[in-house]
Swiss-Prot record:
CDD domains: PBP2_LrhA_like (cd08439). Residues 11-68 form the HTH lysR-type domain. PANTHER family: HTH-TYPE TRANSCRIPTIONAL REGULATOR LRHA-RELATED, TRANSCRIPTIONAL REGULATOR. It comes from Escherichia coli O157:H7. NCBIfam families: PRK15092.1. This is Probable HTH-type transcriptional regulator LrhA. Keywords: DNA-binding, Transcription, Transcription regulation. Residues 28-47 bind DNA. Not known, does not seem to act on the proton translocating NADH dehydrogenase genes (nuoA-N) which are part of the lrhA operon. InterPro entries: LTTR, LysR_subst-bd, Tscrpt_reg_HTH_LysR, WH-like_DNA-bd_sf, WH_DNA-bd_sf. Belongs to the LysR transcriptional regulatory family. Pfam families: HTH_1, LysR_substrate.
Length: 312
C-alpha cells in the first residue's frame, strides 16, 4: 500500500533539460555544448538527477552509457514536463501577440504535418488569426518570396530561405492493393505534371537504376494521383503518410530501388523583415518535436547514450 505521507519530489527543470539533451544528442559532450555547460558539469548533473529520483538512470558498460528502464521511463515524462513548461512561458510572454499569420502549405503537407503546426501555433498564440493557403509544392517558394505568405510548409528544400525540419518520413512506392506489377515491363508511373520535385526525384531514381518506365497517368493534383493509383492505373512514390488500406507498398523484391526520405520543412524568408513570422519560426525552432527520429547507437568507443533493450 502506498503511504499518503510519502514526500513529493520536485524535479529540477535544468536537470531534466540536460537529461533530455543527452538522450537526444547521444553523447555527454554534445549535450554539454547544447546546454552551454562543460562535460564534467553534465556528468555531475546526471548524478544529481539520479540521487534526486533515487533510481539509476544510466547503466555503465565500459565507455558506453545505457539508459536503464527507469531512465527510459523518466525520459517520456521529462519531455512532457519541459514541453508544458516552455509552452506556459511562451504563452504568457506572447499571449497578446495579435495579427494575421499567412501560412502556405504544399499539398503533401496539408493533411500530414500542417495540423500539428496549426495546433502548436494556435495553442501558444490564441489571439493570432491563421490564414492557410494550399498550393502545389513547386509554387510555394514563389509565394514566400513575393510575401504572399509569411511562412511555408513544404517538402522541397529551398536554397534561398531558412528551413526548419519538422519531420523526416520514409518515401515508398505505392500501388493498388490488388495491383500486380508485370515483371520485365516498363514501370507504369502515376505522377503529377511538371513542375514537381517528386516527379523529378522518381524519374532520377529509376534512371539511375537503369529501370525502364513509362507515364501511365499524369495528374494536376495530388488527390487525382491517389485516385489513379487506387484505380490500378500504375505506381507512384509518396511519403509514408499516403499509406491506406486500399494501397500496398512495393520494394526491392518487386524490382524497385529505395527512395530518399521526405523532409517536411517550415521555411522563413529572413529578408522579408516580417517580425510576426520571425517570432513563430524561432518558437518552432526551439520546440522539441517528438516526431523526429534520432539514432540511438554510436560508433565503437564513443561515450554515447544507448537505450538498453532486453536481449532474448
Amino acid at each position: 500500500m502506498i503511504s499518503a505521507n510519502r514526500p513529493i519530489i520536485n524535479l529540477d527543470l535544468d536537470l531534466l533539460r540536460t537529461f533530455v539533451a543527452v538522450a537526444d544528442l547521444n553523447t555527454f559532450a554534445a549535450a554539454a555544448a547544447a546546454v552551454c555547460r562543460t562535460q564534467s558539469a553534465v556528468s555531475q548533473q546526471m548524478q544529481r538527477l539520479e540521487q534526486l529520483v533515487g533510481k539509476e538512470l544510466f547503466a555503465r558498460h565500459g565507455r558506453n552509457k545505457l539508459l536503464t528502464e527507469h531512465g527510459i521511463q523518466l525520459l517520456g515524462y521529462a519531455r512532457k514536463i519541459l514541453r508544458f513548461n516552455d509552452e506556459a512561458c511562451s504563452s504568457l510572454m506572447f499571449s497578446n501577440l495579435q495579427g494575421v499569420l499567412t501560412i502556405g502549405a504544399s499539398d503533401e503537407s496539408a493533411d500530414t504535418i500542417l495540423p500539428f503546426l496549426l495546433n502548436r501555433v494556435s495553442s501558444v498564440y490564441p489571439k493570432l488569426a491563421l490564414d492557410v493557403r494550399v498550393k502545389r509544392n513547386a509554387y510555394m517558394a514563389e509565394m514566400l518570396e513575393s510575401q504572399e505568405v509569411d511562412l511555408m510548409v513544404t517538402t522541397h528544400r529551398p536554397s534561398a530561405f531558412k528551413a526548419l525540419n519538422l519531420r523526416t518520413s520514409p518515401t515508398h512506392w505505392y500501388c493498388a492493393a490488388e495491383y500486380v506489377l508485370q515483371k520485365g515491363e516498363p514501370i507504369p508511373l502515376v505522377l503529377l505534371d511538371d513542375p514537381s520535385p517528386f516527379r523529378d526525384m522518381v524519374l532520377a531514381t529509376l534512371n539511375k537504376a537503369d529501370i525502364p518506365w513509362r507515364l501511365a497517368y499524369v495528374a494536376s493534383t495530388l488527390p487525382a494521383v491517389r485516385a489513379a493509383v487506387k484505380a490500378g492505373l500504375g505506381v507512384t512514390a509518396r511519403p509514408v503518410e499516403m499509406m491506406s488500406p486500399d494501397l500496398r507498398v512495393l520494394s526491392g523484391v518487386d524490382g524497385l530501388p529505395p527512395l530518399p526520405d521526405t523532409e517536411y520543412l517550415l521555411c522563413y524568408d529572413p529578408s522579408s523583415n516580417n517580425e510576426l513570422a520571425q517570432v513563430i519560426y524561432q518558437a518552432m525552432e526551439s520546440y522539441h518535436n517528438p516526431w523526429q527520429y534520432s539514432p540511438i547507437s554510436a560508433p565503437e568507443g564513443d561515450d554515447s547514450l544507448l537505450i538498453e533493450r532486453d536481449i532474448e
